Structure formats: C-alpha cells, structure tokens
Amino acid sequence: WARGEDPFPALAATLSESQRGAWAEDLGRLVELGRAVTVEDGTDRAERLADAGRLAQRVFPDHELGARPAGLLYEDCESRGERTDPMEQVTFRRDVETLAGLVDPWVTRSRIYDLMVERYVARYGRGGVCEDPLAFFMSLAHAPDGDAQMLRAAGQDLASGPDPERAAMPGGVSASPRHMGAYLQPVVVGRRASADDNRTDEPAGAGSGGRLTVVNAFTNGNGALQARFHRLLGRQYRQRLARGIRAAWGIDRVLEIQVSTDCNTAQAVSCGVLPPLGLPGEPESAQAVPLSSLRLAHDPRTDTLFLADARGPVGLAYLGLISQHRLGGYLAWLVLLSDPWARLAPMADHWTSRRRRMDPLPDEPVHSPRTVHGRLVTRRQSWIFPAGHVAGLLDRDSAATLVRVASLRERWGIPAEVYVHQHRGPDAVSRAATFDEHKPRYVDLRSPASLLALHGWIDLAAEHLSLIEALPARDQQAGVTPSGRTTALEYLVGLQWPKNDGDMR
C-alpha cells in the first residue's frame, strides 16, 4: 500500500474468498478500530486495545517475534487540561538560557563528519561533484570493521570536552543547525516528605520562588522527539513543526530521511512531517524526491558537503525514533550529512552523562554533592557504594533491614527516596532480573516492601551501587491534574543555535 494509507482495507481487498471467510471478521474489527478511536471515550478505547491485543496473540505465535502480543503498536493521548507554555515563565526561561550557555561549547562538529569530508575530497576533489550519492555513502559503509581512521575519529568524539572552535564550525547547507534537546523537570521545594526525612527544607540552588529545574537527560533538539507525536497531535501541529524545521535549516526545501523499518517498524510513526527523500526499499510516495535525482557536492568555503539538484541545495532531516548512532550501512552516513554534530555534554543525570565523567569506581563509599547553577540542577546528589555495603543490609527480616538502612541513611545523609543504579563487573554475563543495568530503580528506603524488592533486584554480578536522590521526591512534583491532584511534570525543550553564515543559501 502507499505510504500513509490505512493498511487494513488495502489488505482486505487482496483476500481470496476462502481467506475472506477465515479472516474477514478480524480484519473488519481492525478497520473499525481506526474510526472508533477517534470518537470513543478512554474506557472504550482501552477495551478496543485489549481486543486488538487478543487478536495479535492469535496472529503471532509465541516466540515468533518476541513476547506476546508482538506485532501490535498502539498509542493514545487524552488530556482535559490546558498546559501553559513553560517558556512564558520568566524563571524557567532563565534556567533554559543558563543550560544553553553551559552546553554550547559541547555541541561541536563531529570528527566522523570531518573524515567523511576528507574521503570525499580525496575522491572528487575540493569543490567536486558526485553524481551518485548513494554509491559514495555505500563505499563508506563498506569500510572494514577495523578501519583505524574511523575508530580514531569516533574515539576522539567520545573523549572530547568543550571546544568553542569546533562549536563554531559550519555543518553545511543540507545539515541541521547545532542542536540539543533536554528533558527538564520542575521541582517544588520547601516541603518535607515526613518527619524522619533528613533533607533540608530548602535544597541547594532553590533560589526564589521555592522551585528548581532539574536536567534529567539530553537528546537531540532537531525536532525528532516532537515528530514522534505528530500523528497523535494532528495536522496543525505537524505543519507548525515542518515550518519550524525549514526556518531553522534556513532553506525552503528540507527532505525527511524516512527509515520506516530500520531496527523496528515503530520507526514509521515519526515519518511524514516533511516530504520524503526517496531511498531504496522504502515505500513509494508521490511527494518523494529520489536520492538518485540529487548530486552530492563539496563547498570549499566551509569544507562541508551538501545535496542539490538543478534548483539548488536541499536540506535533510532525520526525525526517526532510532538514535542516529544505531543506524547501519549507508544510512548512518546519510544521516550524518543531515546531523554532523557531537552532543556529549555531561550536565545531566542520565547514565551516559554520569559514566562519561566518572573515574574508576572506588572501593570505598563516595558522596558527590548536587551541582547547581542558580535554580538549575545539572547533577543530583549521589552516593556510590561497593555493592556489598548495601546488599549486606538487606534480608527477609524487614524490621532488622529497616534499622540497618536507617543507620546508613543517617551516617551518609541519604534521603528517603532514591534511584538505584547497579554497576556490574566487566566480565559479568548474567542480566538477572534487571535485564538492563542502565535502568535505575526507584526505592523508598522507609518501605519494607520497597527494600525487599531492591534485595531481589540486585544482580549477583553487581560490583557497585549508585544511590541518587529522587529529585523531585513524591511530595515535590510540580504538575497538577485538571482534578487538582499532584502529578509528575517533565518538559522536552529543544535548543538550537543559528546556523553559521557560511551554511545559509
């Protein structure tokens, strides 16, 4: 079927009489699902989802595509409340501006991109033109796994620190502007969770108004995370996002690299914000501009590469769900052309931000204070313990466990609510119950049930545990539902820096 078309009526039209007798009823329910979810209330939509899940369990046998109900992706959203734009709040905007200043020198031109330009110039010369861009990108993708230059360039990007000179380098006419996305969580401070909670009423950096803004994690800020929801939020949202992308790229024609099935088919949900770049194996579209119709050229003024046709340069945007570094083959290099920036700022509590700046884990407990810049928290307070220091306090005697954990909290000043990371040794193979050691676990150190769950969660291969303050704690959440209940609130903010003058056409 054509890109964007409802697949179920198209599939129903292909059935033979015998197939229609076996499957027509199921297909009819799926066809109806698309209409029903737009008019029914939340309870009925949930029942529709459960019905589709039961159908998926019959269609996909156990273990064929993973755990049941593999093959089913359903998304929904509903809100009766109105949210104000957080950037209209002076203090929050100031926090975002502070963060932008901190991460600015960390958003630099990638050395992998430099290598791509170097290999292009070696083949086509300065100012040269390649009539077959796909062939060039595939030649890069077919480099051997042990390519020393590629490994060195990737290592330099990972190990590099802030570099204003590389931050000032152009990325090319086809590329995005420098960008960074940040997940920011507002915190209401000045309350105490309970009488036994030893946190101070005003945490460091509370500033005026009794509020903090915590940097939870970084992502990209080119619009990909917003594109993730364009099908849910509708046409006007999609058009506004497309206008914003074209304005930021500084070019009227921006094509979307739509990799609808790479890694998983959920990639397709973000496709469709911009006209697609036609790629081999992708669904056809009347709006697509084939890669084969474009030329790849070198701009000697900026030492960058760009795509163009007879009308002039075109921009590229990759808005997919799958991270750029996980794409394979020629696609990784094509996406690099659209987004040549390394974004490895350590100012967040995400696993990669913490581990990147951390020395070898110690054999003794270590406390790291909160890092604040005015009201902006870029690193939560944390404690690292050898795993035995914590695991040894936990057993099935809940009373004894509570006493020992309370003593640990009092000695180290640990709040009642924390997130726990476990660090397994380099030779560990077992995933145990966690499957992914990078995912933190919320723990209430006052709760026997929470401590018992923590005891069962810790991998036997874990060598160290990190306890990171839960900021906000449950009583510090800044969100409020339409009914007045407190709830978690997190903003995704996209930071973009204006393109270098040499990148504008």
Question: What are the residue ranges of the model-derived segments?
Answer:
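Type-3 copper protein
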Residues: 1-266, 305, 415, 420-505
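Long, compositionally biased intrinsically disordered terminal regions
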Residues: 261-279
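Long C-terminal appendages of very large multidomain proteins
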Residues: 273-278, 284-505
